[in-house]
């Protein structure tokens, strides 16, 4: 029998008092402090993990003000806070061991739209694709693109100054932010927008509480203007995090403090609302998918595409393409990326033209295609062909494959997984090929596998080396590669963070600034957050502070995973392989993953959340000296002799005795076992599979509810009940029956058996069937027309008309349908964790079908 897990980190008294007092301050949002909630937000899309003290989910700007004002009471002055959006950051931006303020659950309102002036005002928790879905009927869109656009929030995009495909033309998020409403750590609301430079010092037009910040930073940036322009890298992906350069427009006639906040990663203020610039949706789009016999050829050929005035050029390597071919998404694009067996695609450039002038686009596409034809005819640049697509559905399918590539890399086989830590380096595009050649040589010298894809037009290529961070030697290599790549980007006049923000990589910040400018950044932090209470450890520390930035070797998920024996990790590899990509947070209600997450908006009830629960459950079990054999369901059985002890444990549970296993159970109970995660998640983590294993072990310690036995035995009972459907349906429809079942079993809307039953309905259509023994003597011609139909209990006994109609249809199509005898398949047993019974049932069914 497994032990009770009670040794989990507890809240300290000050945090507990703060949460209680906040509730009394009429805080309207949600407050979460149990271990499951804290674990669900302990990770993002990076390798890092830090357990927060608590999570706050404000519903309004007023709620955020309440959070900050209460935190300024003397008793709570040492508490720190980290704002959080979609949690899609790849460098630990939104995780910390403090109080997390998550704006993604409730602050999701689109507040105001001005179609004529082309702007929209939104709350920080609005998802990027959600906004564009709202804007599409008006012919407008928010331009910055990113691969996580279906779950990344606008607040998160602003805080990391996100950008992606098309940035050469559309720029970064900060280029489209017109104004912000933020809450400072002192509880004051700060409104920022562009103001005339002449008015900043004398006729200050904005709210008085922001005057000092505006004027001080204005003067400092004015005084340091020459060195700022001279010393910062001249890149399309300019330096994010307190953007000293772009606070002024080109002629310095306007000053905008908003540019300091964009890219600040929650280290200066809580960004709550934003006014965003919108663009017309291009009426016409064309993709040219150029295929190469090597990735290096695709890389070196990209500048040629950029010179052809393309909107964007995206490059993908063979590793990513091969992983895509193994995923369900390849079926949607294989006709758009055809290849010959003797000439496989080893590199791909996705070239897009877009605009409102069809003739101009056609001319550009024709010109590029003519040049490509010439190169192919001459055997130049290793081009093996190209394909065009101009219809929107095809274009969207290509980009969906490209976006999913990020997650697909995490599904590589083996313990070493491609991970993000040097994946968004940026160098001047003219140096990219040489830089990547040196980058690849560095990785090859360590015999590492890696995948590459990205925005070569902007000099950004995503590189994810494959490492197993459970191996301490590879953790050292992680640090070594980080250090070497940082030096390499400096050598080529680039940046370590061209797209995804700094996060923990702020550790390298000083390498990219002169000492003078680094002190200016620290001064900005001091002005906004002098006591280092907002997302401490990121971007920089306040001037005159002795605090330190996070190390590149900050606490990682692997530090916890390493405590779990390898055999346990293998047994629960579905949960262990989750890399945090967060596709299960997709806002779109039409995406099939994950129903419980969509309804509850609680990340505990998502595949990622459930995987995190099971990983921690395994770690705690290992720390209680539970052996791998005890968590191998093939070697364990729930014994009747333990019934008394299970009864005693269940009484203790009813009395409120804590066991972390109960929190895991609560997360698993809301899973519908629909298995959408098994196909839609790029990692294919398959929650129902490890959920069944967890239930098996959980109920070795605690009694099962009666409804579990009812559901598990349905397949066995249904054939007998179906012999008298009218009788059973009569009792099922009685109100007293429904009331008793709901109160005792928690089940409502019980289905009715089919009347007449399946056998009677088959007689009506003249189906006679054949015994299995008769089939063995049939000729090959007769067997070729046979169609075997395998029954399941739900259609055969509760929706028999479907089976009858299908049999009738196959007869009319000229087949000889054979309805196989019903045999339980054990699915219900598996869902409820009756694994021993399921294994026996599944084996019997398999032997029957393989006859």
Which positions does each model-derived feature cover?
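Mobile "lid/hinge" segments at catalytic clefts and subdomain interfaces of large enzymes
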Residues: 154-250, 254-326, 330, 343-350, ...
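Iron-sulfur-cluster electron-transfer modules
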Residues: 412-416, 645-824, 829-851
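Iron-sulfur-associated redox domains of electron-transfer enzymes in respiratory
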Residues: 132-134, 142, 425, 429-447, ...
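N-terminal flexible segment immediately upstream of the FAD-binding catalytic core
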Residues: 1-72, 76, 86-118, 147, ...
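Terminal amphipathic helices with adjacent charged low-complexity linkers/tails
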Residues: 274, 308-416, 454-456, 599-600, ...
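N-terminal glycine-rich flavin-associated loop
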Residues: 40, 46-77, 81, 99, ...
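Flexible inter-domain linker/hinge segments
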Residues: 2-6, 202-248, 528-595, 601-609, ...
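Ferredoxin-type iron-sulfur electron-transfer modules in oxidoreductases and energy-metabolism complexes
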Residues: 550-581, 585-721, 839-845
């Amino acid at each position: 029998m497994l032990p009770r897990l009670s040794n989990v980190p507890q809240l300290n008294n000050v945090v507990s008092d703060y949460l209680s007092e906040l509730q009394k301050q009429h805080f309207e949002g949600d407050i979460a402090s149990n271990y499951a909630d804290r674990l669900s937000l302990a990770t993002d899309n990076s390798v890092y993990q830090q357990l927060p003290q608590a999570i706050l989910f404000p519903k309004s700007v007023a709620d955020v003000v309440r959070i900050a004002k209460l935190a300024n009471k003397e008793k709570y002055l040492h508490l720190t806070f980290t704002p959080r959006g979609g949690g899609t950051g790849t460098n630990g931006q939104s995780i910390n061991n403090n109080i997390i303020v998550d704006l993604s659950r409730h602050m999701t309102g689109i507040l105001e739209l001005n179609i004529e002036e082309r702007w929209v005002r939104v709350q920080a928790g609005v998802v990027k694709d959600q906004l564009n879905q709202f804007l599409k009927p008006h012919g407008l869109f928010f331009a910055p693109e990113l691969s996580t656009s279906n779950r990344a929030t606008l607040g998160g995009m602003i805080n990391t100054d996100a950008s992606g495909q098309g940035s050469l033309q559309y720029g970064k998020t900060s280029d489209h932010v017109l104004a912000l409403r933020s809450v400072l750590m002192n509880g004051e609301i700060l409104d920022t927008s562009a103001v005339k430079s002449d008015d900043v010092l004398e006729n200050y037009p904005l709210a008085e509480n922001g005057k000092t910040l505006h004027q001080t930073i204005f003067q400092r940036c004015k005084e340091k203007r020459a060195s700022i322009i001279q010393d910062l890298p001249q890149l399309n992906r300019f330096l994010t995090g307190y953007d000293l350069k772009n606070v002024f427009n080109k002629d310095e006639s306007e000053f905008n403090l908003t540019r300091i906040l964009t890219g600040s990663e929650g280290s200066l203020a809580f960004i709550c609302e934003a006014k965003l610039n919108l663009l017309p949706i291009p009426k016409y789009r064309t993709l040219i998918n150029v295929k190469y016999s090597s990735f290096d050829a695709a890389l070196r050929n990209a500048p040629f595409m950029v010179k052809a005035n393309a909107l964007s050029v995206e490059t993908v390597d063979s590793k990513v393409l091969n992983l895509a071919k193994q995923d369900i998404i390849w079926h949607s694009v294989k006709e758009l990326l055809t290849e010959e067996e003797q000439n496989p695609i080893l590199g791909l450039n996705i070239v897009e033209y877009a605009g409102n002038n069809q003739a101009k686009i056609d001319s550009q596409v024709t010109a590029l295609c003519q040049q490509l034809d010439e190169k192919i005819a001459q055997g130049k640049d290793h081009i093996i062909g190209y394909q065009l697509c101009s219809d929107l559905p095809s274009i969207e399918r290509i980009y969906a494959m490209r976006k999913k590539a990020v997650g697909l890399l995490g599904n590589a086989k083996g313990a070493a997984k491609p991970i993000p830590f040097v994946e968004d380096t940026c160098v001047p595009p003219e140096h990219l090929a040489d830089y990547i050649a040196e980058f690849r040589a560095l990785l090859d010298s360590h015999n590492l596998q890696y995948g590459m894809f990205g925005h070569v037009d902007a000099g950004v290529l995503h590189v994810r080396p494959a490492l197993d961070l459970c191996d301490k030697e590879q953790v050292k290599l992680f640090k070594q590669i980080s250090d070497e790549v940082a030096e390499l980007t400096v050598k080529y006049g680039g940046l370590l963070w061209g797209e995804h923000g700094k996060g923990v990589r702020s550790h390298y910040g000083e390498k990219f600034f002169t000492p003078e400018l680094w002190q200016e950044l620290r001064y900005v932090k001091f002005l906004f957050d002098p006591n280092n209470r907002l997302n401490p450890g990121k971007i920089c520390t306040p001037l005159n502070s002795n605090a330190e930035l996070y190390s590149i070797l900050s606490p990682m998920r692997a530090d916890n995973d390493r405590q779990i024996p390898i055999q346990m990790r293998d047994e629960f590899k579905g949960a262990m392989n989750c890399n945090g990509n967060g596709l299960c947070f997709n806002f779109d209600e039409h995406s099939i993953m994950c129903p419980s997450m969509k309804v509850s908006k609680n990340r505990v009830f998502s595949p990622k959340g459930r995987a995190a629960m099971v990983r921690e459950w395994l770690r705690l079990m290992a720390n209680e000296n539970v052996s791998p054999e005890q968590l191998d369901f093939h070697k364990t059985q729930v014994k009747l002799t333990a019934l008394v002890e299970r009864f005693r444990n269940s009484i203790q549970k009813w009395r409120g005795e804590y066991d972390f296993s109960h929190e895991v159970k609560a997360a698993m109970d809301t899973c519908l076992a629909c298995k959408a995660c098994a196909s839609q998640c790029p990692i294919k983590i398959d929650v129902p599979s490890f959920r069944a294993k967890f239930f098996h072990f959980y109920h070795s310690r605690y009694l099962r509810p009666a409804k579990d036995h009812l559901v598990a035995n349905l397949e066995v009972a249904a054939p007998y009940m179906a012999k008298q459907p009218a009788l059973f349906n009569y009792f099922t429809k009685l109100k007293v029956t429904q009331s008793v079942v709901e109160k005792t079993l928690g089940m409502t809307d019980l289905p009715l058996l089919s009347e007449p039953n399946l056998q009677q309905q088959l007689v009506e259509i003249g189906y006679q069937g054949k015994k299995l023994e008769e089939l063995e003597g049939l000729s090959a011609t007769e067997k070729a027309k046979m169609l075997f139909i395998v029954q399941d209990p739900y259609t055969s006994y509760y929706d028999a008309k479907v089976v009858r109609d299908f049999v009738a249809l196959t007869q009319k199509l000229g087949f000889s349908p054979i309805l196989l005898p019903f045999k339980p398949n054990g699915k219900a047993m598996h869902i409820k964790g009756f694994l021993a019974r399921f294994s026996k049932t599944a084996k019997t069914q398999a032997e029957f079908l393989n006859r």
